[in-house]
């Protein structure tokens, strides 16, 4: 049986500093929002190639580090209560060329990149050819990463019905490209406004850029 880590802390909304914001964005102003950036991955890509790593799991690991560093990206509704997961794990798309479909596969997050890479590699080896939508099953404490490496974009919006209690961040990666002496990659993120404001997304994206600039290949 797969190990599932689902520890969490319950938020007392009545005492929460975001109480009014949460209630507003859960009722009259209910909304999610998307933001797309052109991430400079020049240094990151160079280090990935130098260390002969795979780009996809390396980038997923950086996103997972950031999601686990900030509580606003680990929130969910569970049994009618707002909770903060102790940890969240990346659920990422795996493309099946033969059927032109994809699967959503999750891997347990680990702080250490090499440990995570080992877990990721095992999961892909075990489930990567399985055509089911969720070949490994589903867990509650996930965030989502989707890859669209066939096209670059400057804007990307998800339109999902019934998002009132869906707080998990959703990332979409596009095709990276060269601009001058830089390599840029489109990256879109969707979050729920009830738990996450522009400040939080901005801080995370700035930290993401710093991680990409300084990444040392899991050393």
Swiss-Prot record:
Gene3D superfamilies linked to this entry: Chloramphenicol acetyltransferase-like domain
UniProt-annotated catalytic positions: 193 (proton acceptor)
Enzyme class: transferase
Lineage top rank: taxon: Bacteria
GO function term, MF aspect, one: chloramphenicol O-acetyltransferase activity
Biotechnology: This protein is used as a marker in many commonly used cloning vectors, such as pACYC184.
Keywords annotated in UniProt: Acyltransferase, Antibiotic resistance, Plasmid, Transferase, Transposable element
Pfam families from the UniProt entry: CAT
PROSITE patterns noted in UniProt: CAT
Entry similarity comment: Belongs to the chloramphenicol acetyltransferase family.
Subunit structure: Homotrimer.
Additional note from the record: Transposon Tncam204 is derived from the R plasmid NR1.
PANTHER family assigned to the protein according to its UniProt record, in alphabetical order: CHLORAMPHENICOL ACETYLTRANSFERASE, SLR0299 PROTEIN
Protein name: Chloramphenicol acetyltransferase
Lineage of the organism: Bacteria, Pseudomonadati, Pseudomonadota, Gammaproteobacteria, Enterobacterales
